[in-house]
Amino acid sequence: MNDSIEIFKRQISHINEIFHSYENLTNDELREKGIQIKITVSNSSDKNETLNKALPEVYALVKETARRFSLGQVVVMANEYDIWLASNYDFVEIKGNKAIYHNKWDAGGVPFEWNMVHYDEQLLGGILLHYGYAIEMATGEGKTLVATLPVFLNALTHQGVHLMTVNDYLSKRDYHLTHPIYAFHGLTVECIEQYRRYDERRKYAYKCDITFGTNSGFVFDYLFDHLATDPKECVQERHNFAIIDELDSILIDEADTPHIVSGGMYYNNEDIYKKHLSLIELSLIHISEP
C-alpha cells in the first residue's frame, strides 16, 4: 500500500504541472480541453485504461475550473446546454451570446460562494478514490471537494456515477454545492432525494452522468426495481461507479441492518378497486339475503 501511495504522490506533481499550463487558456479553451478528453474516452475500447491515462489531465482541468470559479464569474460562449441551465438554475445567466457562470448561487436555500481550490492532499485523496481505495478524512478536510475529482473523471464515460451520502441533507447539499463545476463542462447532474419513487424526474436523475442520493435511497430503488412487473417502472439502469461517504458506518456499523420492502407497491390501484367493487357489492347482497 505504501509503495502504491508513493507512485500516486508522483502523479500530483504531474497534475500541478498541467494545472499551471492551463492558467493561460481562455475559458472557452478550457472547456474545449474537457470536450476533447470526453471524445477520447468515448472513442476508447478500454475506457478504464483510458480514464487512468487521462487522470492527470482531468484532475488538472477540475482544479483549474475550481480556481476560476473562486476568482469570480466565468464567461464563455453560450451553447444549448448553457441556455437550458440558465432557464432552470440561478448559477448561469445568458447575456447575448455569452453564458455567465456565477460563483455565487443558492445551495438548497442557503447562499453559497465558491472559494475552494484543491490542494495536494486532496488531489491524492481523489487519486486513491478513483483506484478503489477507502480513505479517511476528518471533518473539514474537504471530502466534498475531493470527490469532485474521481466523480468528474468517471462521469466522462456517460455510464453514470453514483455519489452516496448518509442522509438526505448531505446529498442535497453536495449536489447544490458542486453542480455548477460539473455543468460548466457539460456533465448532467441530479439528486434522487428531491423526487418521490415514481416521479419521472427520479428516473431522469439516474440517466444523468452524476447522481447524488442517500445509500438507503439507492438501495431501496434497487429493491423496488427487482419487484417491478413492468420494466418501465424501473428507475436504475446502470451500476458503473460509486463513491460512498461514511463507508465504515454504512458497510460495517450498519451492515447487519436490513433494507426491507414491506407492503404493496406504490402504484395507483384505483382502477383495480373499481373493477372489483361491483363483485364485492354483489357478494354482500347475496350474503344479506335470507
What are these regions (language model features)?
Residues M1-L284, S288:
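Conserved P-loop NTPase motor core
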